[in-house]
Amino acid sequence: MTSRTAVDSEGSWFEPDHMTELRRRLPIPYVDIIPVRTDVDGSVEEVGLLLRASGDGQIVRAIVSGRVLVHETIREAIARHIEKDLGPMAMPRVPVSPVPFTVAEYFPTPGASPFHDPRQHAISLA
């Protein structure tokens, strides 16, 4: 079975070669999320980070992150990625109108910005 890449929640798919071509030509929107659990006073008690294997096989911490799909709001993308990466018991409370604390641009060219993604030009709302 060929791996395919989802681009919207209605079931449209791009073949991997087509997605690679799109990534070469278009900036892709992403969300970077740092989910936290707070106590009744609003103090942070827990931070939701992921453990992933790096390219050299080491286990590293990573933030929840992923693409925004076609016809998906930023809020929906945040909730989807938190549930996908941290599980349904994460039960995120996402603000009605989330506001990013920063915007990061990832470029395929090293040194073009502090952020590098060799696959694409990505714009990430953090």
Predicted regions and their residues:
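Generic secondary-structure boundary/loop-capping signal
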Residues: 19, 23-25, 60, 65, ...
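Active-site segment of metal-dependent pyrophosphate-handling enzymes
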Residues: 87-126
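Short regulatory "switch" loops immediately downstream of catalytic or recognition motifs
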Residues: 34-40, 83, 87, 104-108
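Acidic, metal-coordinating catalytic segment for phosphate/diphosphate chemistry
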Residues: 1-41, 114-124
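A generic structural signal for short beta-strands and their flanking turns/coil linkers
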Residues: 29-31, 57-59, 64, 94-99, ...
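Short N-terminal secondary-structure initiator segments
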Residues: 1-11, 75-99
